[in-house]
């Protein structure tokens, strides 16, 4: 399952901004970077008229698994999990979240990875 279009984080400027300005939250198998998108420099002529929301992206490198089938399965699993967890949330500001899986994450089961993801989202204050 793919993240809904309004929840996708895209564009290299967004990722650069998250890496420079975002807060990091660590677990044994992933890193969550979160930032308030309202702090981003405004692009001239482009004003966001949409309601505040949560946009996210997931990065799974070749170091996690050499097999693209496994990486895509993980990506789909996380997209489905995040779309269920974050779709009905209401927030007062726009939040950007970026999850990077560590190479050691394949030692854990899928359910353990999703639990760690939930813990990081709670730790970051995105979910309760």
UniProtKB/Swiss-Prot annotation:
Its EC number is 3.1.26.5. The keyword Cytoplasm does not apply. SUPFAM superfamilies: Ribosomal protein S5 domain 2-like. GO terms for molecular function: 3'-tRNA processing endoribonuclease activity; ribonuclease P activity; tRNA binding. Pfam families: Ribonuclease_P. It catalyses: Endonucleolytic cleavage of RNA, removing 5'-extranucleotides from tRNA precursor. Keywords: Endonuclease, Hydrolase, Nuclease, RNA-binding, tRNA processing. It comes from the Bacteria. GO terms for biological process: tRNA 5'-leader removal. GO terms for cellular component: ribonuclease P complex. Signal peptide: none annotated. RNaseP catalyzes the removal of the 5'-leader sequence from pre-tRNA to produce the mature 5'-terminus. It can also cleave other RNA substrates such as 4.5S RNA. The protein component plays an auxiliary but essential role in vivo by binding to the 5'-leader sequence and broadening the substrate specificity of the ribozyme. PANTHER family: RIBONUCLEASE P PROTEIN COMPONENT. Belongs to the RnpA family. Consists of a catalytic RNA component (M1 or rnpB) and a protein subunit. This is Ribonuclease P protein component. It comes from Prochlorococcus marinus (strain NATL1A). The gene is rnpA.
């Amino acid at each position: 399952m793919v993240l809904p279009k309004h929840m996708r984080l895209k564009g290299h400027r967004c990722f650069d901004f998250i890496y420079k300005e975002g807060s990091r939250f660590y677990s044994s198998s992933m890193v969550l970077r979160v930032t308030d998108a309202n702090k981003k420099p405004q692009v001239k002529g482009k004003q966001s008229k949409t309601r505040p929301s949560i946009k996210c992206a997931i990065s799974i490198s070749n170091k996690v698994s050499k097999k693209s089938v496994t990486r895509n399965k993980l990506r789909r699993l996380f997209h489905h999990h995040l779309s269920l967890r974050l779709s009905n949330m209401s927030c007062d500001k726009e939040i950007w979240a970026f999850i990077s899986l560590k190479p050691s994450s394949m030692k854990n089961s899928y359910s353990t990875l999703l639990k760690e993801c939930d813990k990081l989202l709670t730790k970051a204050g995105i979910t309760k």
